[in-house]
Swiss-Prot record:
Protein localization: Cell membrane; Golgi apparatus
Domain note: The normal, monomeric form has a mainly alpha-helical structure. The disease-associated, protease-resistant form forms amyloid fibrils containing a cross-beta spine, formed by a steric zipper of superposed beta-strands. Disease mutations may favor intermolecular contacts via short beta strands, and may thereby trigger oligomerization.
Residue ranges of the region described as Disordered: 28-110
Keywords: Amyloid, Cell membrane, Copper, Disulfide bond, Glycoprotein, Golgi apparatus, GPI-anchor, Lipoprotein, Membrane, Metal-binding, Prion, Repeat, Signal, Zinc
Record carries keyword Protease: no
Native organism taxonomy: Eukaryota, Metazoa, Chordata, Craniata, Vertebrata
Source organism (scientific name): Canis lupus familiaris (Dog)
Protein's recorded name: Major prion protein
Amino acid sequence: MVKSHIGSWILVLFVAMWSDVGLCKKRPKPGGGWNTGGSRYPGQGSPGGNRYPPQGGGGWGQPHGGGWGQPHGGGWGQPHGGGWGQPHGGGGWGQGGTHSQWNKPSKPKTNMKHVAGAAAAGAVVGGLGGYLLGSAMSRPLIHFGNDCEDRYYRENMYRYPNQVYYRSVDQYNNQSTFVHDCVNITVKQHTVTTTKGENFTETDIKMMERVVEQMCITQYQRESEAYYQRGASVILFSSPPVILLVSFLIFLIVG
C-alpha cells in the first residue's frame, strides 16, 4: 500500500517536471533616455514646430484653421459643430446628430488584463478607450535655453498637467512609441477638456509638450519596472523546480 502511494507521487512529480508551464510574455524593449538629442519622432511636424501634431487639421497652436479660443474654423474652446467628445453636427457619442439610436456604435471594451496589471498606478479613464491616468507628479524643472522662457515657465507651470494618460506598457514595442502616444493624448486632453479652451500660446504648447514628455518617460520607467516584477514572480512560481518542491512538501504533509 505504501509503495503504491509513493509510486503515485513519483508519477505526479514526473508529469509536473515535464509540463510546459513556462510563461511566455512579450516584454517592452527599453528605449532611449530623456533628452538624448534630436527628434525621436521623424515626420512629426515641421522643423522648429511641435513634435506631437494631431492626425489632421492645424497644429496644436492653431487647430482646424482657428486660434485658441476663437470660434472661426473651430478652436479648442469652441469646436465647430460639437465639442470635444461629440461628433460633427452636435449630439453625444452614439447620437450622431440626426442619427437614430439603432445606429449607435458599440462601446469600446476595456481589456481587464491590462487594467488589473496597472491598477496600482492609476485608474481607467472613462471615454478614452482604455487609457489609464497616472498618479500626480511634481512638474519637472526644465531649462529652455534662455532666461525669458525659463522665467515664463516658472510663472506658468501651474497651468500645465501634472498627470499623464497612458496605456499598459505591454501594448508597445519600445519607450518611444509609448511616450509619443502618452504625450499626444495627455496634451490633447488637457487643452481640450481640462482647461475648457484656455487660450494657450505656441510657447505654452511647446513647454507643455516638453513637460509632458518627461513625465511620460518617468511613467514608462515605473510601469516597465512593475511589469518585469510581475512577470518574474509568475515565472518563479510556475517553474518545474518550484512545483517539485511544493509537491514534495504536500507529499510530506499528506503522508
